[in-house]
């Protein structure tokens, strides 16, 4: 009896272990999915790194643009450095602040849509016109925010249209293709014979006999 009880206990334990394994696997899968989804949302450190990188690239592009603009205005090689510095500052603020605000809003809201881009544009306008009057700052905020929002909406719409067109082309069956129309017109046999005799008469003209003088 004791042996039977011990064997039954072993069977129960093994069945419980086998039943708990799928649950543990399911929990591991859910934990993995949640961790992968959490990795999609950028962390504040990642936002700061993006801010630094975008600001540096914007400053470089702005300096090149400003220096070229100074040379175009014939300010000389030394005088163009002033324009290069101002343009580098403007482009660095544009790229850095916009990237930082978009990244932070994506982390807070958990979405990546045109609202984030519009708010980032507003913050960029405020940063550009910060040492100014409140009316000018508000106008710059509204201008940059509206422009960024509209541009992002147009980009999303174009990508959606491109995906829909490609999906339609892939799913379209060859049965819906229209058959090619034949433009050949049947010609009667009598017309063919008359046309062939006319062509022969053109290729082999008859020799006319003129009367000779005696």
UniProtKB/Swiss-Prot annotation:
Region (Disordered), start-end ranges: 1-35
GO BP annotation list: protein insertion into mitochondrial inner membrane; protein transport
Record-given protein name: Mitochondrial import inner membrane translocase subunit TIM22-3
Alphabetical list of Pfam families matching this protein: Tim17
Source organism (scientific name): Arabidopsis thaliana (Mouse-ear cress)
Recorded superkingdom: Eukaryota
Tissue localization of expression: Expressed in young cotyledons, roots, flowers and leaves.
Transmembrane segments: 38-61, 88-105, 114-130, 137-154
GO cellular component terms attached to this protein's record: chloroplast; chloroplast envelope; TIM22 mitochondrial import inner membrane insertion complex
Family: Belongs to the Tim17/Tim22/Tim23 family.
Membrane topology qualifier: Multi-pass membrane protein
Annotated compartments: Mitochondrion inner membrane
Induction: Up-regulated after antimycin A or rotenone treatments.
Start-end of Polar residues biased regions: 1-17
Source organism phylogeny: Eukaryota, Viridiplantae, Streptophyta, Embryophyta, Tracheophyta
């Amino acid at each position: 009896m004791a042996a039977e009880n011990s064997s039954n206990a072993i069977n129960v334990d093994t069945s419980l272990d086998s039943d708990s394994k799928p649950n543990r696997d399911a929990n591991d899968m859910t934990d993995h999915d949640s961790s992968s989804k959490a990795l999609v949302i950028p962390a504040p450190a990642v936002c700061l790194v993006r801010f630094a990188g975008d600001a540096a690239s914007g400053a470089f592009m702005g300096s090149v643009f400003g220096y070229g603009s100074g040379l175009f205005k014939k300010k000389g090689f030394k005088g163009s450095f002033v324009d290069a510095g101002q343009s580098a500052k403007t482009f660095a603020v544009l790229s850095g602040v916009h990237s930082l605000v978009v990244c932070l809003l994506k982390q807070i809201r958990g979405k990546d849509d045109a609202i984030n881009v519009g708010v980032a544009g507003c913050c960029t306008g405020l940063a550009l016109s910060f040492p100014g009057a409140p009316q000018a700052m508000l106008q710059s905020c509204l201008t940059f925010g509206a422009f960024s929002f509209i541009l992002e909406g147009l980009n999303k719409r174009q990508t959606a249209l491109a995906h829909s067109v490609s999906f339609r082309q892939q799913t379209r069956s060859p049965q819906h293709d229209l058959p090619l129309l034949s433009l050949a017109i049947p010609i009667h046999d009598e017309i063919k014979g008359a046309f062939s005799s006319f062509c022969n008469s053109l290729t082999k003209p008859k020799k006319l006999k003129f009367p000779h003088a005696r």
